[in-house]
Swiss-Prot record:
Name listed for the protein in its UniProt record: Tetratricopeptide repeat protein 24
Domain of life: Eukaryota
Organism: Homo sapiens (Human)
PROSITE patterns: TPR, TPR_REGION
Feature: compositional bias, Basic and acidic residues: 462-472
Compositionally biased region (Polar residues): 441-454
Region annotation (Disordered) ranges: 1-31, 418-481, 548-582
Keywords from the UniProt entry: Repeat, TPR repeat
Amino acid sequence: MSSPNPEDVPRRPEPEPSSSNKKKKKRKWLRQEASIQALTRAGHGALQAGQNHEALNNFQRAFLLASKAPQTRDTPVLQACAFNLGAAYVETGDPARGLELLLRAHPEEKAQGRRHGDQCFNVALAYHALGELPQALAWYHRALGHYQPQGDQGEAWAKMGACYQALGQPELAAHCLQEASQAYAQERQLRAAALALGAAAGCMLKSGRHRVGEVVQVLEKSRRLAERSTERRLLGHLYNDLGLGYSQLQLFPLAVEAFLQALPLCWVPGEQATVLRNLGMAHNALGNYQEAREFHQKAADLHGSVGQRWEQGRSFGSLAFALSQLGDHKAARDNYLHALQAARDSGDMKGQWQACEGLGAAAARLGQYDQALKYYKEALAQCQKEPDSVRERLVAKLADTVRTRLAQVGLVQTHTLTSAPGRLQAPGGASQAEGTPAKAGSSTAGVQHRSSSGWEDEEFEEGHQKKKEERSANVPVRAGPGRPELCFLPGTVNHSHHLASSCPTFTKHTPCRGTVLGKASIYSPGPRAHLPFVGPGPPRAEYPSILVPNGPQANRSSRWPRESLSRSRQRRPMESGICTIV
């Protein structure tokens, strides 16, 4: 007898889930939902506390729970978890993985509202961090459209300005930053508005398309906004930045005024040292060498007290220059030696050849021509990567020192001294009387004596001759004499050009950035994420900032490299000087 076909065997209908089972599943889902909410809140709190990796761990667990629960697959809850996790990845330095998750959250073009603006903004941040700036700009534009009705467009404008800066389009960057400032002012975020406007002025300078009056007008507006803010420490940074802007315009009396306003508002020793150094630079430019000496001495002492060897070395160099202008060439030599040692200790190659050039000039002033030759040769050997004008200046000084040395020992009659094959001669073939030191100035015969450093004297001298012309013409931003290098307080981008010769520097401080998931901005409280379970309104964190840096900042917690400022060795990618504060 054949066995019955299993398909022919009647099956009992599967029992429908009992009401008790439904209740169990519902309770289980409610527990999972509560866990997702708790993990999301914990992740958000960790971000606010700067604990990025703990935040990432919480968002990962929330995303896994949402992925496993059948009720949340392909739902807004899962999308929100993907969004938060993606933003956290961007925040912690993994923009590629973050971008994948952010796109999974489906930031729809047709959707409107702040939440969708946040989605677009974080996608833009990821592209920005990956260096895909055109894509980043497109998503910032999209975020801007979502934010406009909500009044949140300031951050999007600010980040667009950063992109345009990185693309080498300072004019567009200036426009975006001015729009950002206006938006922040409308939102009563006076701190962010003032900083954005200060950054816009820097971009205007860099573009070279604006007259001095236009830039000054923007700087003054930034000052007025800052004065309405109650954040006193911010005011210190901003006044320092204003001083930098005035210095770039060669409006040194206004720069001194701004730096003096910054000084009592900067309480951290490193920040105070930065402002003091800037004050010294501005007074050097004005020819107030006694005041400059006092400020540079205080700056060097303060930088040394907090272990800022790089900055201390530059302060010693500026102090030596002021001393040389006061005629104290022995003290100038001693401080150039301090500057040289500090530059060697901190790996500051530019500072080393600058100090050697100053030592050569000081030795020549003291009649120690063998020492002068030694230091000029050392400076020339160390500046091979500098512009041609630097090497040409050193060659001229070296040639003039050789000629002066020969005249001094009586080997050659000064009036018959001429060039010979393989012999260096000062430009123009000028000569000087035996044993007679050359006068400080611009004559070719006295090149090595123009200043004890070979930088500020000739550069500021030529700069002052051009000042009247520059005030009536567009402001050029290019390498050349007459413009001191700027020093920034950490957190700022130096908008000055690279100088052809070795100028001392004004300085800028750079602020540390905190973190909040979602939108990030240079001037604003920073990024925010749409955290679906954290209650109304995304929290923001307040973090001081100065100018827009090159490149993206993934979220508020990402630390930007400190560029071209008065900083310690590890944070010195750009060669610049007037100093910024962090």
